Every structure is written in C-alpha cells, then in structure tokens.
A protein has these predicted regions:
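Flexible, acidic/Gly-rich N-terminal and inter-domain linker regions that tether
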Residues: 1-121
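Conserved, mostly hydrophobic/aromatic
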Residues: 72, 135, 139, 297
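A short, charged
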Residues: 78, 83, 111-115, 123-125, ...
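Short, charged beta->alpha transition segments
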Residues: 114-117, 127-130, 161-166
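Canonical Radical SAM [4Fe-4S] cluster-binding loop centered on the CxxxCxxC motif
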Residues: 121-158, 209
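Conserved catalytic-core segments centered on acid/base and nucleophilic motifs
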Residues: 129-130, 142, 175-184, 207
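Conserved AdoMet/S-adenosylmethionine-binding subsite of the radical SAM
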Residues: 161-171, 184-329
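C-terminal accessory regions of radical SAM enzymes
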Residues: 322-422
Length: 444
C-alpha cells in the first residue's frame, strides 16, 4: 500500500504541482487528467518509445482512442511493462490495427437487435439499455470499440426517454441492464432520474448496472452515489476484474461500500492471452473476489471484435481453466465460461463434460478428480408432462403467469404443449429442394 501511496503522490505532482492526494482521490480530477496522449504516458511512466514505435502507436490511437485514468496508470509495473497485465489492458497495441477476415465491428449484432436507439433486446425478458457512450478508461479488449471513444457523449433525456418508452410498452421485460460505455460516468442526479423512471414501470423487477469503475476508477464509488443506488433496490452491479493485481486497497474499499449498502455484486472477466490465461492466476482472482463479496459470474471467451486477435486464446484454454476451478474451489467461486455467439445468438455456456453416458436406468458421471461413478435413475418417476396449462397444474405455479411463457429452441422441442418436432437452419438445401418439388407438383 505504501508503495502505491508513494506512486500516487509522485504522479499527482507530475500531473499538477499544486495538487495533493485529496485531488488524486477526486474522481472528477481523475477524469480531467486522464492520459490520452502517448507523450503524456511517456512523461508520467518514464517509458520511452522510439520514433518508429511512436508512429505506429499514433496510428493505433487515431483509430482506437487512448484514455487511462491516473489511478489505473499507477498500477503499471514499468520495469516489465510489456508483460504487465495493467499495461496490456489499457495502452495501445499496434496489433489492434490487424483485422482478421472473421472479425466484425459488431460481432454480437447488438445494433441489429436494437428496436429503438439505446436498446438491445435479445433475450425474451430482459434488455440492454445503453445510457452512456463514455468510459473513464478505454479498455483495449472492448467488444464495443465501434462505439466507445468514437462518438463520445452521454445521451440527452429525450434520447433516454425512447428507451424508457420501449421498456414501458414491453411487459415481458422484467430485467434491465444499464450499460454503455459506463453508466457511472453519468452524474448522480442523472442516474437517479433514470433509475426513478425505471422503478415507475411495474413490470421491471430487477435493474442491473455494468461498470468497470471499481476496477479503473474506484474513487467514483462515493457515499453520494451509493445513497442513490440504495433508493432503488433491487439493484445489482456487475463489474469487470480481469487480474488479481486490480484488487487494490482502493478497489476493495469501493466494493465494500457497495456490498455494505446491500447491493449484490458480480464479476465478468474476459479470458485474455498474456493477461489472465493461467489456471493458477484465475483461481487466485476468483478467490480474492469472493473474499471481497463479489460473486464470479461469467468468464467470457474474447469476442470476435475487430483488432482483438492478439487477445484471443483457444477455447481449450478456457476449458483447462474451468477444470482447474470446478471441484478445486468453492462452487460459488466458479464463473460460467461462455462464448457470446456471433450474430446475436447470445451467451453459450462452454463447460467441461462430466456426463459420460446414460441409459434409462443409470447415468455415468465423472468428477473433478477423474473418478467415474454411476447415479441410479428413479424407477417410478411420474412425469407430470407439462402441457402449458398452469390452471390445472398441481405444482402451485398459478400465481406465476407461467402459461404466458413461450418456448423457443431446444426447450420448444422438449415441451409437451408445442407440436414442433425439429428445428431447421435457414438456407437448408434439402428443405429448399422439398419446397421446389412441391411447387412443381402444383403446376400442370
């Protein structure tokens, strides 16, 4: 801690000779003094780039802007910066200019699933609500590089109102995830207004906020902000720690403020080559998170966004990490490893296989140690065979309006109230031949 305090003092004076640690801990001062130029980065860190390196770095930040908070900059180990996980996540890399054929600006088709500006509606009962295009730091692995830093603004109330109107007019939406950019870039007053408007919508049960502020600018988690959030429970917060070194004294204090206010905390890590692609490191991270009352939620496979190929690991590395966690640490410390499907397919869990085989009588399983065991299936199970008619159900679900739910995908095939028996991909040649033959038979 003393090492960081000394570094904070040193950086504060380099940035502003009249400033002190009180200024340093002011989140607005941090934003005003964010590092956006290579020359400023060199001055503050002592790291020097030669002319050729500087030229290509300038080209990189011209396409993907640079912005690092002084706080996050202070965590960089300058003696080994090329291998430093803080540096790799925050500073420009010329490899970002390399765009592979399979990479896309919007690989998750968030814009295509946007019924009104600011809303992405992909899953039946929840929406993503973009309320900011601004971040305190531009993470180099960001899946929304097409937005963040390109059009730098916080939407006006009339723009946000379009999203609120859509949510209000869509009764199926029970869960709203506020995202961006970073929602905590908004003023307390503006955020309070948005939360108040959402709480007026009767069918909105849960509000979630995705923010990396506890990681890159923990001073933003002020008592005033926490007081605003407490007014609107249930509010959940997901943050984005990728490496154990990000859990500093300051970040832990920020997390404690939120947890003490009764706000459930989750964490979404991204698997990044050269940053956290190590089973021991990931185990350390999830255990430290749980110790600080943060539930590891997702471990994301790096998306197919443009310029991220140097960050991507094989999926096998993620499986290896999951093998090292499941059974080897507490169950609530283990995140779900997911691939966010290109084209807007949503998050797909990708986990080690523990179900080896099964028959009508037995299931063959293996555990984390490699022990193979059997589980005896029940002999007299009376399957109620759900037909979707909850009024006749004996399982006490009448109050839950479950009959209004629509089955999709594999669940649709398993359901007893839908006559669908197969799902066919688009552009299936066999189906097209069938249709062509049927059309031909109808002609004389």
């Amino acid at each position: 801690m003393e090492n960081y305090r000394s570094r904070h003092n040193e950086l504060t004076k380099k940035i502003d000779s009249e400033a002190n640690l009180t200024n340093w801990q002011d989140w607005k001062w941090q934003l005003r003094n964010s590092i956006q130029k290579i020359s400023t980065f060199e001055t503050l860190t002592g790291i020097r780039f030669d002319a050729e390196e500087r030229k290509i770095l300038e080209q990189t930040i011209e396409k993907f802007p640079l912005s690092i908070t002084p706080y996050y900059l202070s965590l960089i180990e300058t003696n080994d910066y090329k291998n430093d996980p803080i540096y790799l996540q925050s500073f420009a890399d010329p490899r970002e200019l390399i765009v592979q054929d399979w990479e896309q600006a919007d690989p998750l088709s968030e814009d295509e699933d946007s019924p009104v500006p600011g809303i992405t509606h992909r899953y039946p009962d929840r929406v993503l609500f973009h309320i900011s295009n601004v971040c305190s730091m531009y993470c180099r692995h960001c899946t929304r590089k097409r937005k963040v830093g390109d059009i730098d603004f916080i939407p006006a109330k009339d723009q946000v109102q379009q999203g609120l109107d859509y949510i209000r007019a869509t009764p199926k939406v029970r869960d709203v995830l506020l995202s961006g950019g970073d929602p905590f870039m908004l003023s307390d007053e503006y955020l309070d207004w948005i939360l108040t408007e959402l709480r007026k919508i009767e069918h909105v049960e849960v509000i979630r906020i995705g923010s990396r502020m506890p990681v890159v600018l923990p001073y933003r988690i002020t008592d005033e902000l926490v007081a605003v959030l407490k007014k609107h429970h249930p509010v959940w917060i997901n943050t984005h720690f990728n490496h154990p070194r990000e859990l500093t004294t300051s970040s832990r204090k920020a997390l404690a403020k939120l947890a003490d206010a009764g706000i459930p905390l989750g964490n979404q890590s991204v698997l990044l080559a050269g940053v956290n692609d190590c089973p021991r490191l990931m185990k350390s991270l999830v255990q430290k998170l749980v110790y600080n009352r943060v539930r590891p939620y997702y471990l994301y496979q790096c998306d197919l966004s443009e310029g991220l190929s140097h960050f991507r690991t094989p999926v096998g590395k993620g499986i290896e990490i999951m093998e090292s966690l499941i059974g080897h640490t507490s169950g609530f410390s283990v995140p779900t490893y997911v691939i966010d499907a290109p084209g807007g397919g949503g998050k797909i869990p990708v986990m080690p296989n523990y179900l080896l085989s099964w028959s009508p009588h037995k299931v063959i399983l293996r555990n984390f140690e490699g022990v193979i065991t059997t589980y005896q299936e029940p002999e007299n199970y009376d399957d109620p065979g759900c037909d979707g008619d909850c009024d006749k159900c004996t399982l006490q679900l009448k109050f839950d309006d479950a009959h209004e739910y629509n089955s999709v995908g594999i669940w649709k095939l398993l359901s007893n109230w839908d006559e669908t028996y197969s799902l066919t991909p688009e552009n299936n040649e066999r189906m097209e031949r069938r249709e062509g033959a049927a059309d031909g038979m109808g002609q004389d």
